[in-house]
From Swiss-Prot:
Keywords: Dioxygenase, Iron, Metal-binding, Oxidoreductase, Vitamin C
Name of the protein in question: PKHD-type hydroxylase xcc-b100_1388
Residues annotated for 2-oxoglutarate binding in this entry: R171
A GO molecular function held by the record: iron ion binding
GO biological processes: DNA damage response; intracellular iron ion homeostasis
Length: 228
């Protein structure tokens, strides 16, 4: 399921985040890439262990915790701490597939995170740069994504994807991965659509007895499928 989620960051959060990132020291993004990705990757990345990266990551995680749409669509069990990248001067990231497992070392260990869902949070206004589209090979064809600052897109971690060259301006984004309670994308899509329908029915016909039944179906399916 490829899903744009608008306004994950408030204007105040976005301004605070950009202020921190604009003052940061960036490194060559290939340092953190795997063998396959390093051959396709040309960007700058904020070192994961820098104080600014940790502060910015915490801000993004706090914003995600307040997004009911994100929770409903991703059903997160674990979230890899958000990372940050920057593209300018023709930089790009060729077609690649994300590693199936990432190791979260933010708490001193090496906790595995299965990358069921990939996510990109756009931090630059689309009018401020040319190119930089996130191109995703989806089951429904090729999708090109370039969202307003503060908007998020999530998509299956199995997807082949790339970032087009940025030919003017600078594209800054956060990217991260989610280990979902449901590793199967079709099951996540089904439960998301069911949850959206329940929410709409609750608004249109509050108190309808069928809502209790539908809510029960949702939770029973989640109980059957969830890996917790």
């Amino acid at each position: 399921m490829l899903l744009p989620i608008p306004d994950v960051l408030t204007p105040a959060q976005l301004s605070q985040l950009r202020e921190r990132l604009d003052a940061a020291d960036w490194a060559d993004g290939r340092i953190t890439a795997g063998h396959q990705s390093a051959q396709a990757k040309d960007n700058a990345q904020l070192p994961e262990d820098s104080p600014i990266a940790r502060e910015a990551s915490a801000l993004v995680l706090d914003a995600l915790s307040r997004s009911s749409t994100f929770f409903s669509a991703a059903l997160p069990r674990r979230i890899y701490p958000p990372l940050f990248n920057r593209y300018s001067g023709g930089q790009s990231f060729g077609y690649h597939v994300d590693n199936a497992v990432r190791y979260d070392r933010s708490r001193g260990g090496a906790d595995p995170v299965r990358t069921d869902v990939s996510a990109t949070l756009f931090l630059s206004d689309p009018e401020s740069y040319d190119g930089g589209e996130l191109v995703i090979e989806d089951t429904y064809g090729t999708q090109s994504v370039k969202l307003p600052a503060g908007h998020l897109v999530i998509y299956p971690g199995t997807s082949l994807h790339k970032v087009m060259p940025v030919t003017r301006g600078t594209r800054v984004a956060s990217f991260f991965w989610i280990q979902s309670m449901l590793r199967n994308d079709a099951q996540r899509r089904l439960l998301f659509e069911l949850d959206v329908s329940i929410r709409r029915l609750t608004q249109d016909t509050p108190g309808h007895p069928s809502l209790i039944q539908l809510t029960g179906v949702y939770h029973n399916l989640l109980r059957q499928w969830a890996d917790v």
